[in-house]
Swiss-Prot record:
Zn(2+) binds at H63, E66, H160. The active site is at E224. It comes from Shewanella sediminis (strain HAW-EB3). This is Succinylglutamate desuccinylase. The gene is astE. It catalyses: N-succinyl-L-glutamate + H2O = L-glutamate + succinate. Transforms N(2)-succinylglutamate into succinate and glutamate. NCBIfam families: arg_catab_astE, PRK05324.1. It holds the Pfam family AstE_AspA_cat. The lineage of its organism: Bacteria, Pseudomonadati, Pseudomonadota, Gammaproteobacteria, Alteromonadales. InterPro entries: AspA/AstE_fam (IPR050178), AstE_AspA_cat (IPR055438), Aste_AspA_hybrid_dom (IPR007036), SuccinylGlu_desuccinylase (IPR016681).
């Protein structure tokens, strides 16, 4: 099994051949510089023999039909195995939901990105593949981060694509960070990747990026890289800047980041999440409305249970509208312009 990986250098192929689990782990060297370990299906670690200061997690396929990040991560893994890219920082790649990749669907039974921070074991417990996988992914992130000194720089980029189009093609969600400022340097790293829009979340969630931010104080982001497309139909030239910056990060090459400049980025503050309370929940706007579409104060965004849900601020933009979620889950995030007061500008 692992001999095939060493010959083909195609980790995605190995992952999809064993979508549920791999019975045995393996470890091998690439050249005289990197130790490689496969911990499970879709879980591979590159450990430089001369260790540096960063621990990097790159995750994709938390939703199985979000294919551009899957292709990007597999290209990076292949480059590392072929020694076209040499790891100078520790890096863990996670292909989140292999069964859903094969199925070409967002998930099999349940949205994996609503099952972290222990949500996998709440309620009915570990009753489906996504809940079991969420618990395993938490374990692998813990194994990767916890064995290192806390002063190391921990990073987690959870890569996605969105269901609908967006006025800002690429954007990132910066998880809630009580008592910690947001990193201006990380925002400018994202800008150099071609991701010029950042949303600051306002509350705890059960997402993968918040798990790493909360438990390991990682600079963690949920990163949206455009719209969902079938495997092989992504225009990978749209990710040249992102791939180049990830190559530099992993290879410990100079990042050459600009100083923080608010004029180069679009910053939004999440002001509320609207959860579905009744089965009759419906939006008033059409299904083709793009992410970051703005609505004026008083505008009726949605209706449910005989009540109108209105825009509360002077202007609110919306992201991730989805009326089809189960009762109790989030239907949309509402945004307002953000200030820089809670950003560490590095001055």
């Amino acid at each position: 099994m692992f001999q095939a990986l060493k010959e083909s250098k195609d980790f995605l192929n190995l992952t999809l051949a064993h979508p549920q689990h791999i019975d045995e782990t393996c470890s091998f060297s690439v050249g005289d510089h990197t130790q490689v370990e496969v911990w499970d299906t879709g879980v591979i670690v590159f450990e430089p023999k001369v260790n540096q200061a960063k621990d990097i997690v790159l995750s994709c396929a938390v939703h199985g039909n979000e294919t551009a990040p899957i292709e990007l991560c597999n290209e990076l893994v292949t480059a590392l195995l072929e020694e076209k890219l040499i790891a100078k920082q520790r890096v863990l790649f996670l292909f989140g939901n292999p069964a859903a990749i094969i199925n070409g669907t967002r998930f099999i039974d349940e949205n994996l990105n609503r099952l972290f921070n222990g949500a996998h074991s709440s309620g009915e417990g570990l009753v489906n593949p996504e809940r079991i996988r969420a618990k395993k992914l938490e374990f692998y992130v813990d194994k990767f981060f916890a064995g290192q000194r806390e002063e190391r720089h921990r990073i987690h980029y959870d890569l996605h694509t969105a269901i609908r189009g967006s006025k800002h093609e690429k954007f990132a969600i910066y998880p809630y960070r009580p008592g910690r400022k947001f990193s201006g340097e990380q925002i400018m790293f994202l800008e150099a990747c071609g991701i010029d829009t950042v949303l600051f979340h306002h509350e705890p969630t059960t997402t993968f990026s918040y798990f790493s931010s909360l438990n390991y104080q990682a600079d963690a982001f949920t990163i949206e890289l455009g719209k969902v497309l079938p495997m092989g139909q992504n225009d990978m030239t749209r990710f040249i800047a992102l791939k180049e910056m990830l190559n530099r990060l992993i290879g410990n090459d100079p990042l050459e980041l600009s100083a923080f400049d608010v004029n180069k980025v679009n910053l939004y503050q999440v002001c509320r999440a609207i959860n579905k309370e009744f089965d009759d929940f419906e939006f008033t706007f059409t299904n083709d409305v793009e992410n970051f579409t703005s609505f004026p104060e008083g505008y009726i965004l949605a209706k449910e249970g005989g009540n109108n849900i209105k825009v509360e601020h002077k202007v609110e933009a919306i992201v991730f509208p989805n009326a089809k979620v189960p009762v109790g889950q989030r239907t949309v995030l509402c945004l307002k312009p953000a200030t820089t007061e809670n950003i560490d500008l590095g001055n």
